């Protein structure tokens, strides 16, 4: 397998280079090659150097000293059995040869530099006691311990919600300025690349297809692949169907001597099978038809229709409450979802979104409050009829699908459970695979033989097997590449339109909500703070928390004024009063902490929960 093929890039002192592309494009392989961590793989390069030193021979000596690295999942980076303090101090003890006292003192200072409050206290904590954003800051502190000149960042914010992600990006910008750091940032989020990078290199199936200044490449993309990535990107300022890139990456065991994007390119023509080198000086592109297609738009699919506001109510919650010990995970939530409607639910990690979704399905018992489905009250132990009509699609298909069962067995179980197959299970499985745009042959495949997007399609097919009226989608696209994500989102919109499904779509990606949802509810500390039509809420947010969330979303080509919230992410005011009072930048006085805020109508169907009059927001 030739994972990288004639890839050239350089990172200038104090600059940031972005590497973008789908999973399998070679981004992480490039990072591991620079670190000398590819094991037995053969690395051939005309030149691979850092400050004049040959990385083919010196990478192990430079790694952890002059070159630092931060990876995607801090939970796998950090040792769960060792305190944070010892892990941050370790590179100082091993590489800098400091005494334990000096290393401990510097490690505490590093945690403070990465924006962690109470750094001295955190030194004694274990990783499981920290949030995802805090763990990533610890990983950054470890990478900075030996004062590296180059920091390699492999998807450092992928698993984080939008405000935590914005905080990490602010931190990286500050570190680059203070320490004159050079950064190599790998990400599939083009908004992050646009915000943080000076230059960008686009990789496809191991080859560079476009490279140049980030503003030029993202504002005037010239290669069809880059244009396809941008067309598939969910944006706050754009609604309607997304335009996923058709097909899949080529087989790297059989490299195509010509354009390897040709089978997926809507602009491919005779001659594209010939080899082509990068052309251009400052803005380089590898495409035979770059001038011919400059004025052609990327094909856009038709938008699916949205639900009618006159549709009947399907699901209604009234005052749902769920506590875990002293934590009020869901606190008095009342919502309505109509037939065929998509309600988006957004908020930071830990705000209660997933708990609310499970309460709506009676997968968790509510401490109080009522749930009605199709006008009938749903008991704590629901009947099989409710289970058939209300289903869920989970975030991670790797844990949701049984690795020992093939796709046919996975789909057959709900058919038998609800007595729907009636002796025609094979035909019904074929119908379900067709619904989610998978070929019939996939029935014999096992989960490990599927891509991430294909696994999620199987998860959706399983939810559809019982012919439900309502599905909870709990972060179903958060782990997917932008193009695969676009295809899954379009599929859900299509299924909603053709089958009349109602969806509760839970996500921390507000751009995704903008494309799929009819209405959106914003959640914080177990309560809904704002609710209304998605176009209205996202274009004219009234609640201070919603405004802060939207300001944190990185948007290609836009520079919104960031509203930085004080306090720790997810800090909740206990007892009576506004849950957001501890972090609210517009807090008006003691009333915010001493009285529950009222619901106020900002417009027909658009309401907020706040003490501040709507005309002042």
Q: Which sequence ranges carry the predicted segments?
A:
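ABC ATPase NBD coupling module
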Residues: 54-68, 86, 94, 215-221, ...
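P-loop NTP-binding/switch modules centered on Walker-like glycine-rich loops
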Residues: 22, 36, 156, 160-241, ...
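Charged, flexible cofactor/metal-binding loops and thiol motifs
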Residues: 120, 213-314, 533-617
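Conserved ABC ATPase "signature" region
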Residues: 102-121, 230, 424-441, 550
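Helix-to-loop junction immediately C-terminal to a conserved catalytic motif
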Residues: 35, 361
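Conserved ABC transporter NBD signature motif
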Residues: 43-54, 369-377, 386
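A short, proline-enriched helix->beta-strand linker immediately N-terminal to the Walker B motif
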Residues: 145-149, 465-469
């Amino acid at each position: 397998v030739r994972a990288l093929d004639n890839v050239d890039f350089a990172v200038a002192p104090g600059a940031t280079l972005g590497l973008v592309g789908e999973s399998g494009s070679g981004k992480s392989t490039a990072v591991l090659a620079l670190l000398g961590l590819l094991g037995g793989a053969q690395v051939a390069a005309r030149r691979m150097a850092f400050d004049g030193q040959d990385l083919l021979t010196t990478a192990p000596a430079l790694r952890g000293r002059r070159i630092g690295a931060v990876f995607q999942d801090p939970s796998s980076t950090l040792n769960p059995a060792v305190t944070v303090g010892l892990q941050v101090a370790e590179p100082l003890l091993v590489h800098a040869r400091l005494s334990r006292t000096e290393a401990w003192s510097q490690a505490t200072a590093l945690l403070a530099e990465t924006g962690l409050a109470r750094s001295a206290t955190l030194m004694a904590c274990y990783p499981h006691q920290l949030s995802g954003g805090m763990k990533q800051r610890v990983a950054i502190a470890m990478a900075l311990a030996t004062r590296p000149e180059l920091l390699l960042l492999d998807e450092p914010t992928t698993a984080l919600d939008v405000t935590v992600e914005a905080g990490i990006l602010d931190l990286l910008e500050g570190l680059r300025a203070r320490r004159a750091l050079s950064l190599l940032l790998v990400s599939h989020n083009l908004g992050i690349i646009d915000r943080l990078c000076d230059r960008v290199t686009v990789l496809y199936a191991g080859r560079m297809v476009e490279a140049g200044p980030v503003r030029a490449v993202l504002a005037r993309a010239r290669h069809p692949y880059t244009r396809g990535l941008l067309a598939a990107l969910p944006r706050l300022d754009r609604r309607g169907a997304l335009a996923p890139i058709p097909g899949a990456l080529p087989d790297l065991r059989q490299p195509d001597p010509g354009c390897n994007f040709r089978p997926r390119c809507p602009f491919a023509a005779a001659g594209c099978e010939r080899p082509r080198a990068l052309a251009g000086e400052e803005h380089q592109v590898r495409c035979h038809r770059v001038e011919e297609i400059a004025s052609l738009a990327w094909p856009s699919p038709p938008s699916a229709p949205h639900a009618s506001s006159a549709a009947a109510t399907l699901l209604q919650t009234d005052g749902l409450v769920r506590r875990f010990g002293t934590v009020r995970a869901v606190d008095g939530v009342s919502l309505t979802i109509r037939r065929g409607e998509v309600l988006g639910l957004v908020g930071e990690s830990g705000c209660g979104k997933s708990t609310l979704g499970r309460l709506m399905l009676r997968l968790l018992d509510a401490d109080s409050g009522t749930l009605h489905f199709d006008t009938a009250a749903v008991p704590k132990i629901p009947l099989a009829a409710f289970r058939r009509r209300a289903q869920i699609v989970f975030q991670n298909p790797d844990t949701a699908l049984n690795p020992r069962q093939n796709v046919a067995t996975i789909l057959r179980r709900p058919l038998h459970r609800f007595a729907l197959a009636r002796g025609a299970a094979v035909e019904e499985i074929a119908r379900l695979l067709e619904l989610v745009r998978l070929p019939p042959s996939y029935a014999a495949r096992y989960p490990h033989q599927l891509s991430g997007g294909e696994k999620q399609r199987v998860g959706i097919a399983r939810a559809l097997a019982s012919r439900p009226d309502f599905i909870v989608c709990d972060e179903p696209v958060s782990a997917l590449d932008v193009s695969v994500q676009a295809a899954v989102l379009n599929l859900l919109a299509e299924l909603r339109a053709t089958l009349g499904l109602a969806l509760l779509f839970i996500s921390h990606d507000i751009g995704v909500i903008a494309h799929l949802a009819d209405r959106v509810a914003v959640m914080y500390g177990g309560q809904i703070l704002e609710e209304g039509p998605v176009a209205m809420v996202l274009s004219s947010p009234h609640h201070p928390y919603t405004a802060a969330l939207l300001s944190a979303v990185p948007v290609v080509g836009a520079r919104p004024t960031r509203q930085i919230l004080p306090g720790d992410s997810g800090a909740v005011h206990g007892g009576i009063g506004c849950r957001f009072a501890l972090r609210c930048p517009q807090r008006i006085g003691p009333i915010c902490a001493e009285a529950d805020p009222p619901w106020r109508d900002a417009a027909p169907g658009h309401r907020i929960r706040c003490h501040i009059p709507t005309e002042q927001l």
